[in-house]
């Protein structure tokens, strides 16, 4: 098999990275994708750094053994902790994801920028460096959201539980003064509709899925690794929990409009 015909690997701590996979599949419809969700060990955002690193390398090895030509780490926490180590150890293009703060700033809407993310993403040096670029000129507030990925892992993406969780998180803010909400965890796009309800659709909601997918395409094109055959690609999903329910949920989220 030529390298062009090999699949692209996607990895996340659970089902969240499927939000990025959806964007990548739209952008690269000829490609085959292998997705590995580590729902057995989700969430990563409250674990110790060394544990996240070990789990990320295990997932990467799983996908490398399937013969992938590139890897997308579709997990903000794993990216912030492990992306440099992965690039040093594997000789394929490796693309990570981080909170899309730059696009929020470039909107130039004024007002407060809220960054929703896991506690670990917000605590890592990579995020601190990102904040340093803008904190002098922008009103940016990190908003840790422990427990939210766990709800989404259960398939709870709407309804009273999600609404009340978000209502409580945003109760301290004046919605009129929020310009943008950056979704700093790949699980969060699945609750975007409820988030808009809670904030009365006042803020621009931004996630990094498209930017990450565009970077994947750019790197594959520059390396002459894009699939050239005129075909429709396929998506195959694996999960460390190894039960039908989580696989069914994964495909449901992939096909969710």
From Swiss-Prot:
Cite the entry's keywords alphabetically. Answer: Cell shape, Cell wall biogenesis/degradation, Isomerase, Peptidoglycan synthesis
Q: Which residues form the active site?
A: 75 (proton donor/acceptor), 185 (proton donor/acceptor)
Q: In which pathway does it act?
A: Cell wall biogenesis; peptidoglycan biosynthesis
Which positions are annotated as binding substrate?
Answer: 12-13, 44-45, 76-77, 186-187
**What chemistry does it catalyse, as a reaction equation?**
L-glutamate = D-glutamate
Q: Which GO terms describe its molecular function?
A: glutamate racemase activity
Concerning InterPro entries, the annotation shows:
Asp/Glu/hydantoin_racemase (IPR015942), Asp/Glu_race (IPR001920), Asp/Glu_racemase_AS_1 (IPR018187), Asp/Glu_racemase_AS_2 (IPR033134), Glu_race (IPR004391)
Q: Which GO terms describe its biological process?
A: cell wall organization; peptidoglycan biosynthetic process; regulation of cell shape
Q: What is its EC number?
A: 5.1.1.3
Q: Which family does it belong to?
A: Belongs to the aspartate/glutamate racemases family.
Q: Which PANTHER family match?
A: GLUTAMATE RACEMASE
Task: Give a short account of what the protein does.
Answer: Provides the (R)-glutamate required for cell wall biosynthesis.
The record, for NCBIfam families, names: glut_race
Which protein are we looking at?
Glutamate racemase
Source taxonomy lineage?
Bacteria, Bacillati, Bacillota, Clostridia, Eubacteriales
Tell me what gene encodes this: murI
